[in-house]
Amino acid sequence: MDRKKTLINSSVSNNNSTIKGLQLFIADLRSAQQAQEQEKRIQSEIVKIKQHFDAAKKKQGNHDRLGGYQRKKYVAKLAYIYITSNTTKLNEILFGLEQTVELLKSSIFSEKFIGYMTLELLYERSEVVAKVNDEVNYQLMKDLSSSDDNFVMLALNFVGVVGELTNRLAYNDDITTGVFKILRSPTSSIYLKKKSALSFLALLKSNHSILTEDLQRKQLWIQRILSLLDDTENYRLTLATIPLIDFIAKYIDPSYCTRLLPQLTEILYNCVVVGTSRSSDNQFPLEYTFANMPNPWLITKVVSLLSILIASPTERDSGSLLQTNNIDNELLNKLRKCVSVAIELGTRQAQDPMERIVQNTVLFSLINFASKLDPSDEAISNSVTALCSLLTSKEINIRYLTLDSLVKLCSSSGKPAIDAVRYKNLDMIFHLLNTERDSSIVRKVVDLLYTFTDVENVKIIVDGLLQYILSPKNLAEPQIKSDIAVKIAILTEKYATDINWFVIISLQLLSLTSNTTINDDEIWQRLCQIVVNNPSLHRITCERLVDYLCKKQASEAIIKAAAFLLGEYSSLITDRISSANLFTLFAEKYFSAPNVAKAMILTTMIKLYKTSPEIGSNVIKFFQLELNSLDIELQTRSFEYLNIIQLAKVNGNTDILQILFEPMPPFNSKSNPLLKRLGSLPASAGSTTLINTPSEASSSTPDLLSKRANSSRSIMVPMPPPSRRNTIDDANSKISSSEDFSGKDSYYSRQILAPNWREGFTRMISHKQGVLFTSSLMKVFYRITTPDAQQPYVFHISLAFINLTEWEITGLSTQIIPSKTQGNPEYLILNINTPSTATIGPHKRAEQSYEVSIRKPFDVEDSPILAIHFKCGGSTNTINLKTAIGMTTTLISSDVNPSMHLNLAQFISRWKTLSDALGKEGEYQKSGIKLNKDFRKVETISLEDGLLLLTQTVKRLGFDIVDQTSVRSTLFVSGIIHTKSEGNFGCLMKIQYQVNGSVNVTCKTTTAGPLAKYIVECIKNVLTK
Amino acid sequence: MAVQFILCFNKQGVVRLVRWFDVHSSDPQRSQDAIAQIYRLISSRDHKHQSNFVEFSDSTKLIYRRYAGLYFVMGVDLLDDEPIYLCHIHLFVEVLDAFFGNVCELDIVFNFYKVYMIMDEMFIGGEIQEISKDMLLERLSILDRLD
């Protein structure tokens, strides 16, 4: 863009949209060379506009003297003044607010537009909002419900732009419902729906309670929003809807959104794989591509949402998310295919700059997502290789993004990624470190190196980093050098195995600090802690410190560390240097040191005196000198130390010194304070390498050092770094903490079930197959099988959805919601296959299956909920059903296993054994269970018929009945309940038929606890349905 | 995944467009300072040897690109992937270019309100809402002709 154009033709657009007065004003301002001149012009214009506005106000009541065009012109000028003054002149233009609001009321589009546009700019100021909010909201409501789409559009834009600047709109129920109404209305144009989706998002961001306050509204509105994705033909609405869903999944409730997985996968697959295939039958809408590449916007948005919905390997227990082992294999493979195609596309040569940007967008978005797909080691290593080939790219952005992506990959995928990088590309990375001139890239290189350092390569990497800091040609910002120093300190502490090397490097690092502006107390302090805690380091560190002190220029950090450590351990190196010489050394350094270091040296001196009283006269002289110090701290210290020495002399022994300056006890700070300063490294980066070597993770490094050095003393010190939690984690923990007291997921208990759900539920307890649900639109069949006879606690549940209408059912998706996903749940839902098709033709069917594995006893009322969502004939439907899996479902009938059959004597003896062992524990009684309506006129049924029906029911459940004739009115029943984690339980029951048509049940189980109750509840359900 | 703000200023640091999408600060002085800092940071960068991405604060990084004498800058969350925002910026500039016909800084100066109209058609709630250039231009020409 250059300034080749003259003023005259600068406005190419149609004439009636230009505002001549405004153009002249702007031209005037531009021709004014001096800032002062401009300022004068602005002020005179402001005065003029003020006069016009005042005049208009006086004439109120009469017809509008100012006129819409004039008003628009003046307000636009004020807006220009605001922008061009870099938003500083707010107060000078505030007088125009009233007339700006007046513009909103205009029925002329261009006037209304200028009004809204100006307010969009000014709404970032709370004083503006406070003044005009009520009036604006009123006008906003009128425009939202206007019959002119362009007015609605302006109102939606305004909400979308200022919705987050003030929460006044988001807490106005009329506005939130107004916007939502446009979003859900079948008659709104796609254009308005798109805008309303994003405006609604802006409101939701300011006020989550729009959706969370009222449960019913939450369910209803979220389903409405999700159904906007059903239109698979039109990606344009999808594009605007996904960010809204993204936000809901992240901050409101992800559980509603997990059912979108098949749809999202389909979009991604279409964009990345189908959209780019060169085959002639590539029938995909043009919109799936952009600049000859897959549509980057759709891809990044879909990937972002998928990343939220799929739990990463490290957050396995976050309940409401999808786990990779639970995702339909076909979908998982499709997603993986997308990643590999993106890598292929991303490494292709592209000429057009836009094409290259898009290429990178797609590549990095998918590569960063790949770690969520439980990739094979080979796949990871392939991604890494592809990425590393981009490190040599000429484009700086690509190198930056590649490094960023490698850091993420190494942190999330662990060893396979790390190995692939470090074994083949270390030289390359060091080369980048030394040649890059962009500090943000250098930072990424350092992060990457840090991420894959371990015991094996710590020396090479630390050496490379140290060279970088030392090299004078790297004029990088001091901040970076300081960050690198911190990282070196952490790495040496974490991975050093060689004491000598550890000490050399650490001191080298400290000695640097005077040359660069690194000023890190934390580094020398940490070193002192480590040395104190590891006796094997005492002597060697002290020796080296003396060497450093003897040099002319010792850095402040070296002096401080020396003052502290030599004070403690000088007695260990008397063969190298006498206390007297050490004292002289410190006395020399004293005068050039800053006050904090001086104070430390004073303490060192008295410690030296403690071990070598023969240097007393020098020490006393020194302290006496410092009594005159200008610094109060130094003066006080000298005075106190002098008195202590005198006291010792009077007593004739050094007891008081020994007590006051006892040897330093080991430090027990739990974590390395340096770890807080890792900066922008991803959450797990600090601990990645620890994962590979768990033995190291459990112990702490200084400790480790001493062990490796065969020290017999084991010392406690800092714990491994607490891994930082990322934002997603936090969001999830917030959500999962909303469990109710029974430990059930609140999401489960909040489901509103279909009115006649219980009928199918009861049928499912007693029958292995049948009808689960029927309505005028859909019929659902179920079938329960036990795929493996050895595992009677694992059930395969097949569902069939039949379309009963004459129309198509579209957008079919389901969710299986367990009562608990966290905290050791009673059962798990496994191997969920998504419905075989999302579209069911009239009278056609779709099928689906999943498995339930029962881990321990639970109440049948806590069975999984099946949520079915679909569209039919323009209506959006949700059916929530409970699919019964009871403890009785795990029974194996004695027809299959005759050995379980008991005779009466066995039954009685076992009953007695249970009574003796458990007493009333593990027993449950229920009397007066009324038989259901199928046994009509129960009073008239004979005992025989009643017992026959009971027998049939109980047998169908899988119980075994003892053959006996001695107690006619009672059935003696036995069975074995199976669970995965807690094993099998025996169960004995007496079911007594009363003449009045009711039944008493007494149930005993071989375990204390509520199992007996759970069994009786199943039976009661079947008998009374 | 949302744009925190869109800025456009020239080489001298004069602001041409400013749009905040979230509450950056209740203190207006702070947002003016932020703009000044962003200008200093970006104008000091070497576009040959430095990338188009730079961290700005502990909650924001900047994605920017220079077109002739104008810088277009977007502020986004630190965790966001950068390249898509370059797409945003590039598409925005392409639409401006097509709308004004070989756009230059003067077009943006004199028709700032139209540029805001274009921005509103492309970005609301910090998200991009339309990416089809044809669709955008068709809609914009209708709006531009409305009385």
UniProtKB/Swiss-Prot annotation, chain B:
Cited InterPro entries: AP_complex_ssu, AP_mu_sigma_su, Clathrin_sm-chain_CS, Longin-like_dom_sf
Q: Which PROSITE patterns match?
A: CLAT_ADAPTOR_S
Per the record, the coiled-coil ranges are none
**Compartments (UniProt record):** Cell membrane; Membrane, Coated pit
**What membrane topology is given?**
Peripheral membrane protein
General remark: Present with 1390 molecules/cell in log phase SD medium.
Q: Which GO terms describe its cellular component?
A: AP-2 adaptor complex; cellular bud neck; clathrin-coated vesicle; intracellular membrane-bounded organelle; nucleus; prospore membrane
Relate the assembly described in the record. Adaptor protein complex 2 (AP-2) is a heterotetramer composed of two large adaptins (alpha-type subunit APL3 and beta-type subunit APL1), a medium chain (mu-type subunit APM4) and a small adaptin (sigma-type subunit APS2). Interacts with APL1.
Q: Give the source species.
A: Saccharomyces cerevisiae (strain ATCC 204508 / S288c)
Q: What is this protein called?
A: AP-2 complex subunit sigma
Keywords, comma-separated and alphabetical: Cell membrane, Coated pit, Endocytosis, Membrane, Protein transport, Transport
What does the similarity note say? Belongs to the adaptor complexes small subunit family.
Q: What is the lineage of its organism?
A: Eukaryota, Fungi, Dikarya, Ascomycota, Saccharomycotina
Q: Which GO terms describe its biological process?
A: endocytosis; intracellular protein transport; vesicle-mediated transport
User: Is Nucleus one of the keywords UniProt gives this record?
Assistant: no
Q: What does this protein do?
A: Component of the adaptor complexes which link clathrin to receptors in coated vesicles. Clathrin-associated protein complexes are believed to interact with the cytoplasmic tails of membrane proteins, leading to their selection and concentration.
